[in-house]
């Protein structure tokens, strides 16, 4: 064991690295598990730790949380896999069908986003299915077996019944693992707004919040995350019944872009019909000024989601950054994933920020 330990650290070149690594190894119990590795596996791992700081950081952070709770969500939070990994957030995938073939909503790995939206533009049919109770049970149990509690945040109940599947799995597993805790939170959000919510929860967890404290905070503040959307292509809003066929046809001819938001029940509500893309871009940023914490002095993060309309998303981001000089970093632009995108279609831009409590 001592020889293996020395091999593991032969690439570390200074005392600070060694001290930090030893503390993390002891805290994660990895030190006592070296017998499960052979020499070549340890050498391979150390090579990665030495050459790739990001991999080293990700692995050590994961090991540091070995005995803590799992922070989890669904793929419909529409962040990248790199983002989920860097924030130590686990996720489970929704499903969708494209022209009758089933895929996982796996963050664009099976079908890249550009190909997905091009297929929709060319007339492909898409439909989605939520995570079922059996899938949740298997997913949750993989953590419970390791002695970890779980805080799972679901896609809004206003647009999906996935929380019901999660609750069924929770009740089943609590009987099997009475010593463990599973908390389920309805985000009342979607897409990267849901993702921005998860990012804040990860911040609080990393700042020392307990499982119970994080659950309480999530329940108290989920309606402070604002979701505003517009679309320049009404096709899928007509298909989804959010806009009537007659109104959609006339709106398309007149260049009308509907402006919607998510209300206090997590449902999408049409708020305004705005003619021309230029005006709706200005209008959505006006909504941020109206509802964001401290108005133009807003100093939180801002995310944007877009479905095959990066130019429109970039125009919104540029206007936000010009109007809100105290933002916490640049506006982050993410792709609307394949599950959410099956309903929005191409041409949707969504703006997310923290603000006053959402109303009906």
Where are these regions (language model features)?
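A glycine-rich beta-strand to alpha-helix segment
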Residues: 154, 183-184
